Amino acid sequence: MKATHLTSHWQLFLDDSLIERATGFDQRIRQPRKHGILFPDRQPWEHGIGMFQPVYDDGRFHAIYRVNWLDPEIEAFHASQGWKGDPADLGAATEWAYATSSDGIHWERPALLLCETPVFRDGKISGRTRENNCGVPFDFIRDLGRDGNVTDPARRFLLRTRTGQGTPAGRSHHAQARNPGGLYFAAEFPDFVHDPDWQRKLMPINGRMSPRGFGNFTGWDDLNGEWIAFMQGTAPRWFPARDIARHWSKDFKTWESRGVLYPDALDPHTLEHYDEFMEIQVIRKGDLWLGFMAVFHSDRTSPDYMPPFIEKENFRFAYDLPNYCTRKGTTDLRLVTSRDGGHTWNRVANRQAWLPHGANDDDFDRCAYTGTPITVGETDHFYYMAKNGDHLESLHDRTPYYKDRTTGWNAALASYPRDRYVSISTGTYPAILYTRPMLLPPGGLRLNADASHGEIRVEIAAAPAGGIDDIHSAPVEEGFSFHDCTPVQGNGVEQPVRWRRRPDTAALQGHPVRLRFYVRNADLYGFRIEAS
């Protein structure tokens, strides 16, 4: 068996690519702790909140997000352009707002004084004010250095500027989609409030985002040498269910795409509960890509749940499949991983929900949508979009689904110890995990584990390239036995493993070995070699 060259990245047990044998272990998904919504006190211009995009730079959290409100000026502008559709949608003014935080939990929305937003009285616009946090001059930002596998510090951030600010076209989602701004790399979060030369410090990109959209750009795929993005496939790929597509480009100019993640025979597919893949956010995590996928548990029992832009006589599409494009249902988040640049995917932990949606119809996250984590110290802050009701807002005849209340989206926060997504665990009866052959870099072994009620020991054995390779009887490398190993008995995301006579793995260079983990009443999340 060919040995895997390990890097100093964390090796997480999100898949079994490094596991040879794990008899006697349980695989346990670890659901994060929910903290609720970030902005319970909505401002008048925050009729809707969406696309919350947080980053962490120079010791501080920054976020931009989309807000909207109903505005007769925008409705008149859309009418002048001949656009048709849902009246509520055509009357929606869109702006981009800014929030900041020192701890990632408590957020401030400073008055930027950059643009006007409405003042409401008795539900109607009675004036305008600049005392708001709106007017952000870009509508997308992505930390490619943290999440996107980009090592050049000058290209750490990717952002897209806006067009037509201060005009109706600049506040029209429809107009912005047809006339997007320019793409840029940046070395730091742009100080667009205090620095008049902020845009001159950007590195322009002569190109465009993927044809599907810009909200879920992923990063650089070094394996295939291309920029990649993953998101819901375009209609009519919604037939027979929503799915996930991979988009790629060598130069940001020419984009190609194909579907890569589809619901399969193991996913529920009854009219009452038909699973679809609504959306995904993907980040680089060590040597793999980790996806946070929103699974839509759709209800197809009535044609009234179909969108108004599809005529009822076309509901069955080309085949006898009723109500295939429903909007009624809930969403939760599942984990998926890829080691080939997103061409193939692994469904993590038997497809269990990692971030479940709220159990009650009026819970703040009855629909839990995609997001990304930001790691600070030993904690991952996971920011996601949440809706306090069903995904369905209006029926096919455009009447509201909820007759007694108004639902909406908000930004929400969950947290968990760093990288603790899935554990390999045992109870009081111990077990031994055997890895596949690997070539280790020189350095100290570190564990992300909770062994506070038990113990973990590590042994390193030879993995000969030829002849009989028996994972049980292979000789132990001198000084690296279970007996030589000091038990790990704490709870921490980076605990050192020590052998009495071997401070690190420097003596093991050049030949393949296997790690053996003895685990008793403990949870093991991952390991890495810290370079010496």
Predicted regions and their residues:
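Carbohydrate-active catalytic/glycan-binding domains of CAZyme proteins
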Residues: 1-532
